[in-house]
C-alpha cells in the first residue's frame, strides 16, 4: 500500500489501560454471505484523512465487510515487538504499549459486534521492518498472537485490552532478503489459531500484481493464505507490467494469479481485486489517477470474474480516499458493495447494507438536485469529525460535529461528510 502519513512520535500522552483478560471469548460472525468488501483504515495521504472513529465504518450502510488496520510497520531490525501507528491517535510503542488507543479499542468491539471483521496489518511501504532468522520470525508470530489474539495471556502488553483481532495481514513491500522467514511467522500464528476453537481467523496478504511477485512471492509459495488482496495498480512500469487493464494501463492479470497459487500452499485462497478508492489513492497525487477505476469500470471488471471459484471480492486503499470520493450519494466503498451485491454501482436510492437484517429502511426523501449544507444536531457520542469524514446519513449514529471550519454537507440520503 502507499504509506504516506507522518509517523506519530513516542511522546503521545495517555497510555491505554489494558483490560484484564479472563476466559477466551468469541465474536459475532459476519452476517452477509458472498463476496466481501475489504477496506484499509489507519493511514492517510494526499491531503485526505479518514474518520478517526473506526466504528463509523461499521454502520449497516457502510458497505464494508472487513477492515484492515494499518500498520505495525516496525519489527525485526533488532526489535521483536512490532510497533506502529494505527489511525490518527493510536500508537503502539516498541515495548508493545498502546498509547491513546482507548477509542480504537472500543470501536473494534463495536465493529465486531456488527459482524465486521477486524484484521491487523504488518508492513506497508516503509523500510522499517525485516526478519533475520526463523527463530525471530516465530518469536514475533507468538508475540502477535499473545498481544492481539484471543490468547488469554495476561503477561504481555495488550493494546486493545481483552479485544482481539480476527486475523493478520501481511503487506510486505520491502524484501531485504528476509522473505523466506515470513512463512515461519505465519505458521506460528496458525498453530495458535488452532488453540481457539471458538473463533475463525484469517491470514491475508496484499501482494503487488506482477508475477513473479518481488516481495511476497516467496511468502505465498511457502505459506497458507486465506485472502490475497492483490494490488492491481502502480505497476505499469514494472518488468512484467500489470494493472486493471483500463485507461490505457497494463493488462489485468487476475488469471495469472489463479494459475500461480494453484501450485502453492495457498491454492485455496480467495483473490480480491485490489483498487485505489479515488483518483488520488494509488500515489497520493494526481499522477496516479490513471489507475483509478470509476464505479462503472469496476462493475464491468467484477462482472467478468465474479463467477471464478477464487474470486473473493474487492479490496480498496483506503477508507479516507473512499470518503472523499462520493458519487450518486455513495462513497467508493458503498459503490463497491453495491457492485458485489447488485452487479451495478449505487442507484440514486442509496447504498446496499452489509447487514440486511438490521439495516434501516430508506425514507421517501427526494434526492437533492444540488449539494446542500445540513444542520446537524449535537452528537450523542461526542467528538469531532475531520475533513471528508462521515457526519450524517440515513442510519448513521456516529459523531456529527465537523472540525472547524468545515461543515456537514448532505450529499444524499445515505451520506453527509465534512467539507
Swiss-Prot record:
Q: Where is the signal peptide?
A: 1-18
Q: Residue spans with biased composition (Low complexity)? A: 355-384
Ranges of residues in domain GH18: 35-343
Upregulating conditions: Only transcribed when chitin is the carbon source. The promoter contains the consensus motif for the creA/crel/crr1 carbon catabolic repressor.
| Localization, UniProt | Secreted
Domain of life of the source = Eukaryota
| Residues of the CBM1 domain | 383-419
Reactions mediated catalytically: Random endo-hydrolysis of N-acetyl-beta-D-glucosaminide (1->4)-beta-linkages in chitin and chitodextrins
Any GO CC annotation of this UniProt entry: extracellular region
Chief localisation class: secreted
What does this protein do, in the record's words?
Answer: Secreted chitinase involved in the degradation of chitin, a component of the cell walls of fungi and exoskeletal elements of some animals (including worms and arthropods). Participates in the infection process and directly acts in the penetration process of the host cuticle.
- What is the name listed in the Swiss-Prot or TrEMBL entry for this protein? Endochitinase 2
Q: Which organism is it from?
A: Metarhizium anisopliae
**Primary gene name:** chi2
Amino acid at each position: 500500500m502507499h504509506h504516506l502519513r507522518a509517523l506519530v512520535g513516542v511522546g503521545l500522552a495517555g497510555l491505554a489501560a489494558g483490560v484484564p483478560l479472563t476466559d477466551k471469548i468469541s465474536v459475532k460472525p459476519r452476517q452477509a454471505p458472498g463476496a466481501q468488501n475489504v477496506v484499509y483504515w489507519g493511514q492517510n495521504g494526499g491531503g485526505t484523512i479518514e474518520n478517526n472513529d473506526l466504528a463509523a465504518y461499521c454502520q449497516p450502510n457502510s458497505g464494508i465487510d472487513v477492515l484492515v488496520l494499518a500498520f505495525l510497520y516496525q519489527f525485526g531490525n533488532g526489535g521483536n515487538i512490532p510497533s506502529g501507528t494505527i489511525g490518527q491517535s493510536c500508537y503502539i510503542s516498541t515495548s508493545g504499549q498502546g498509547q491513546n488507543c482507548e477509542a480504537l479499542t472500543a470501536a473494534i468491539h463495536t465493529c465486531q459486534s456488527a459482524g465486521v471483521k477486524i484484521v491487523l496489518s504488518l508492513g506497508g511501504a516503509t523500510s522499517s521492518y525485516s526478519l533475520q532468522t526463523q527463530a525471530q520470525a516465530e518469536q514475533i508470530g507468538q508475540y502477535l498472537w499473545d498481544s492481539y489474539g484471543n490468547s488469554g495471556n495476561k503477561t504481555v502488553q495488550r493494546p486493545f485490552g481483552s479485544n482481539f483481532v480476527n486475523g493478520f495481514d501481511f503487506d510486505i513491500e520491502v524484501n531485504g532478503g528476509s522473505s523466506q522467514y515470513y512463512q515461519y511467522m505465519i505458521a506460528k500464528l496458525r498453530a495458535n489459531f488452532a488453540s481457539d476453537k471458538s473463533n475463525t481467523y484469517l491470514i491475508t496478504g496484499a501482494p503487488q500484481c506482477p508475477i513473479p511477485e518481488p516481495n511476497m512471492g516467496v511468502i505465498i509459495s511457502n505459506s497458507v493464505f486465506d485472502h490475497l488482496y492483490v494490488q492491481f495498480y502502480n505497476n505499469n512500469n514494472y518488468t512484467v507490467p500489470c494493472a486493471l487493464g483500463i485507461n490505457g494501463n497494463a493488462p489485468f492479470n487476475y488469471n495469472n494469479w489463479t494459475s500461480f497459487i494453484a501450485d502453492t500452499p495457498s491454492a485455496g485462497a480467495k483473490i480480491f481485486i485490489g483498487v485505489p478508492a479515488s483518483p488520488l489513492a494509488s500515489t497520493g497525487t494526481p499522477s496516479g489517477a490513471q489507475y483509478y477505476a470509476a464505479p462503472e469500470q469496476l462493475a464491468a471488471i467484477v462482472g467478468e470474474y465474479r463467477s471464478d471459484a477464487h474470486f473473493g471480492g474487492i479490496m480498496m486503499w483506503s477508507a479516507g480516499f473512499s470518503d472523499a470520493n462520493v458519487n450518486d450519494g455513495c462513497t467508493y466503498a458503498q459503490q463497491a458493495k453495491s457492485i458485489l451485491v447488485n452487479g451495478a454501482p449505487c442507484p440514486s436510492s442509496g447504498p446496499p447494507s452489509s447487514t440486511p437484517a438490521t439495516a434501516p429502511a430508506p425514507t421517501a426523501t427526494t434526492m437533492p438536485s444540488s449539494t446542500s449544507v445540513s444542520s446537524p444536531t449535537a452528537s450523542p457520542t461526542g467528538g469531532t469529525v475531520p475533513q471528508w469524514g462521515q457526519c450524517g446519513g440515513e442510519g448513521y449514529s456516529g459523531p456529527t460535529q465537523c472540525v472547524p471550519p468545515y461543515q456537514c454537507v448532505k450529499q444524499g440520503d445515505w451520506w453527509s461528510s465534512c467539507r
